[in-house]
Amino acid sequence: MDWSPSTPSEPGCLPAGCQPLGRNRSANVLEQHLRPWRRSDQRWDLLLLLAATRTAEHPGISAAGATPESRRFTALADAELLLEGPDGPRRWPLPPLPAGVSPALLSHVALDCLPLEPHLAVLGLEHPAPFSHLNLEPQDWGPAACLSTGRAMPPERVAWLWRQGLDLGARFQRPVLLTECVPGGTTTAQAVLTALGISVGNLISGSARQPPQELKRMLVEQGLRRASLPPQPSPLAVLAAVGDPFQAVAAGFLVASRQPVLLGGGSQMAAVLALALAALEPRARQDLSRRALLGTTAWLADEQLGPERQPALGWLLDRVGQHFDVPLCGVASGVRFHDSSSQLLRDYERGYVKEGVGAGALLLLAQLQGQPPQALVEACERAVERLPSSP
């Protein structure tokens, strides 16, 4: 894609349309978190973790694929779209969605104008990845069990994945944009946060237009009842009971990292932040809170859940921070599709899809590097037109 030259956004202010999340929104705090991502002379790393959990096989639990069968290859299809673009070679078809288009399309558009080096890791997927990736575990380990069993992963697997995350966190030296593709992952996020003693109530979103909160709550209650965790369980015990492979690697990564980390997503990133904070001493928690920034989409940032009718993600970020006595910071991209020429993109404004594959963080980073929101919208529209069988 041929992008015009851009100038990084001015220090001390957010790019057009961007909004802070939660209470930790003073100008000085925001600038401290955004400064590493404004630099025009900086290269960054993108770490995308693709993972699977049998939790995604419950009908209605996720819209990241319209059927349980299609959700088994969502992560591979989204990764191919991110890397190759809408008209590139593809081994796996994009799964059918109730509405909208894969967020990996938005991620591809933003990635195309950024000096990011992508690294992908595959965890528990049932099919081999047709692209270069990090091998962090044997493929035959397969997906995590449904969290409702209370035995999502063997403790030995959790310990192995945690160590892999520690190794990656220590190995990466440049700022890292960390993101994921895990169908069913918002439900494991809810389970992990609940197991850590954080009251998340109606604060967990999902890919569906109307998140199946009652189904999520039922699965989480079943899993925690069967797990019989002790009071104040360790992060690894929580993961073994109700977690997924992505969370184990990502939390280990955060524990060992010393560089700025931009967390691309919503409640799943809040969960891995909570796991990492639970594993750290108070001083190290403060250090992580100064380096970690959550980046998301405007659609997820604006979503109101539960009777409070308040933006849920900001409340969730605050609640995690309060639990561990650290301030946590988040920013939403300013890209909106109200006036888009594409119905698939306008569906985002109707509450479909919302986020995934780091779309919000990548769009935010593109804006911080000087790309205007309208230019990104138009690039997304052109990308939609290049999709096979695009309406």
Listing of model-derived features with the role each one plays in the protein:
Residues 2-179, 183-391:
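N-terminal loops that bind phosphate or other acidic moieties
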